[in-house]
Amino acid sequence: VRDAISNPISHEPLGKLVGPKATVTIAFDDASGSYFQTQRDDFRRVAIEVIVEELRQAGVELGNIRLLCAQGLHRKLSRTEMETFLGRKLVLQFGYNQLYCHDAEDPDQLVHLGYTRRGFDVEVNRAVLDSDQFIYLNTMWAPFNGGWKLTAVGLGTFRSIRHHHRPWPAAKGNSVDDPKNSSFKKLVWEQGEVIQKTLERKGRRVFTI
C-alpha cells in the first residue's frame, strides 16, 4: 500500500497532491466483494490506516478526512459490518460525522454532471467533486471491476446505474467479464469520461489504489 501511494502509475505521489488545508474523501468497496469476516485483518482497514497516516504526514487535518462506503444501490453497511471491515479503532476515530455510506436517494449527497455522448445520465456522490482530493480504495478483484466502474457505479444513483445494470448491455456485449468487448464496460467508461472532464476543469483527478 505504501508503495502504491508513493509510486502510483501515471500519477504524482499522494503526499504531493494534498496540503494542510485539503479536504479528502476515501471511498471504499462495500460488502459485495468480501462480506465475510476474515481470519486476517481486512484489507480495507490495513489500507485506510496507511492512507490516513500518509495524509496526516502531508499536513491534512484529521477533521478534513472522510471515509465513504461506495455501495451503489446495495444496502448500507451496519455498524457491526463497518467494524468488521475497518476495525473498531477507525470507526471510533472517525465517528458518524466522518464515516458514512453513500445514499443514492439523498439529493443533498448527489450531483448530476450531465450526459454521455449517447445520452446516458451521469450522477454521482458530490464528494467526488467537492473534495480537494478524492481517493478510491478498490478491494474487489474481478474482470468487470476497476476503473471508472468504481466511481460511476459505487457512488452512482438509479438514474445513472439503470443504463448498464439491465439485460441489454450484458446480452449485447458477450460478457461483463470481457473488458474489451463488454457493452457494460463501455457504458461505464462513457460515464467515467464525463466525471473525468468535470474533475479536470477543477484541476483534479481520482487517486485510485
Could you describe each region identified by the protein language model?
Residues S6, A31, T139-M140:
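Residue-level marker of positions within ordered structural domains that often coincide
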Residues V1-D3:
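N-terminal amphipathic/basic leader segments beginning at the initiator methionine
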Residues H11-R75:
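N-terminal active-site beta-alpha-beta segment that forms phosphate/nucleotide-binding
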Residues T38-A47, E81-L86, W148-V153:
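"Short basic amphipathic alpha-helical interaction patches in structured regions
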Residues S6-V18, V122-D130:
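Short amphipathic alpha-helices and their capping/turn segments at secondary-structure boundaries
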Residues L62-T116:
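Acidic low-complexity segments
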Residues L92-I209:
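Conserved, well-structured core segments that form the ligand-binding/active-site neighborhood
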